[in-house]
Amino acid sequence: TIETPHFVLLASMLMLCVAIVTILFWKRDVAVIRRGVLVALFLEYLFFVLSETIFFRDVMETRECHLELFWNYRLIREDPAAANGIWEIILNILLFVPFGLLIGAFGFKKGKAIIIAILSGFLLSSFIEGSQYYFHKGVCETDDVLHNSVGCLLGLGIFWVLIRGIKIIKK
């Protein structure tokens, strides 16, 4: 049987594909097509992230909040059994890499793109952490906000490297 969250995510991917195909065949202007595809990808990404972090998470009995910055690192250093926390850090960074890629793809100037990546990564992550706390859907952690913001900047950097590589190949 297909679990409800997986079904909803599959359905949203199907809707994304339909939206992109519709945009590609409806509009002839390349800039309009690019913008439409980016908006569709951004909305799908946002839905995926919110589904994974809030919508389809189990409700916890109590609220938990860790506002001390770098508490994960201290825990990992002090308790070798908590080494799986490294994976949590890596996954939090990776979760926001696509967000940074999309910010880069929207074509902002470098300085503005960096500011947008930092602010939007911080704000989206803060919204998620606050919602997890409010709705009992996870532990609210400042470390997660930091790691997500780093992931967003990393995604932006990856975008710039990809674009530079494409320009070199085209020459």
Language model region names:
Residues 1-136, 142, 156-171:
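Bulky hydrophobic segments
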